[in-house]
UniProtKB/Swiss-Prot annotation:
Name of the featured protein: ATP synthase F(0) complex subunit 8
Chief location category: mitochondrion
Family statement: Belongs to the ATPase protein 8 family.
Top-level taxon in the UniProt lineage: Eukaryota
Length: 55
């Protein structure tokens, strides 16, 4: 049963992951978002207490 021989498949597996780990991370990290988040002010918004009229 040749499919149980790990010799060729293990090297293919290792080379594939080596290629993925050397090519893909720079491409993913070079991605820029079109809308950069703007920093919010440190002031907290004024909230008025809201009393529910229980009738």
């Amino acid at each position: 049963m040749p499919q149980l021989n790990p010799a060729p498949w293990f090297m293919i597996f290792m080379f594939t992951w080596a290629i993925f780990l050397t090519i893909l991370p720079p491409k993913v990290m070079a991605h820029t978002f079109p809308n950069e988040p703007s920093p919010q002010g440190m002031t907290t918004p004024k909230t008025a207490p809201w009393n529910w009229p229980w009738h």
